[in-house]
Amino acid sequence: IITGSASNEKIKQKIDLPEEYKPLFTGSIDLYSQIPLNYLTKRGFSHDKIYKYKIGYCASGEYKGRIIIPSFDEEGDVSYFVSRTYTKQKRKYKNPRVSKDIVFNDLLIDWQKPIVLVEGVFDSIHEENMIPILGSTLSEKTELFQKIVEKSPKTYIALDPDAYKKEMNIVSNLIKYGVGVWKIEVPEGKDLNDISKYEYQRLKMTAKQVKFDTLFEMINI
């Protein structure tokens, strides 16, 4: 079920999680939940992260055999969710047929601190204050872009190396609106899930601010 409420002349998307959704953070683990829990553990998810992000799974229904990661808006309502298979289904991701123009897990973002823009939801759970762009080009009309411009936090960007052109377009638009942007150099052939916490912190500390005078050179590399 999708509902909407008008706020600042904008419709806030609210949806329901699948009826079959079961949480993986309650401490009550049965045979069905052990398999998705093992999958998350192998991917480096601690119990604290599973609890914080309210990660669950579905053992039946449309999302059978899938991990469910909900997104909560700033009021605590579910605005979206991502589902990823933990079995050998050919289709890795299957998400609800609703708009992705949201700030994923806005409820958990501290806009007074630096944010990090990343590609996908699993990347965003790597560290605090990471926001996935969900495949978006982050145009000026998107909710996430407008919120970044409004709050103007120090902004890091760490997209996959194969998304370089899209990354530069996003950086260019943000700089145009006066947002300070630092580029984290993700190693070729890797994404954030392949990088240790120590390595990520090192890359973040050495990230360089992108300015107009260097942007043209970077775009034409």
Language model features with spans:
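Short, aromatic/basic amphipathic alpha-helical patches
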Residues: K165-G178
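A residue-level signal for conserved active-site and pocket-lining positions in enzyme catalytic cores
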Residues: L40, G76, I157, L192
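A generic structural motif
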Residues: G135, V181-K190
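Short, surface-exposed amphipathic charged segments that create phosphate/polyanion-binding patches used
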Residues: R66-I67, Q146-S152, D191-A207
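TOPRIM metal-binding catalytic domain and adjacent DNA-binding surface shared by DnaG-type primases
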Residues: I1-I68, F72-E75, I109, V149, ...
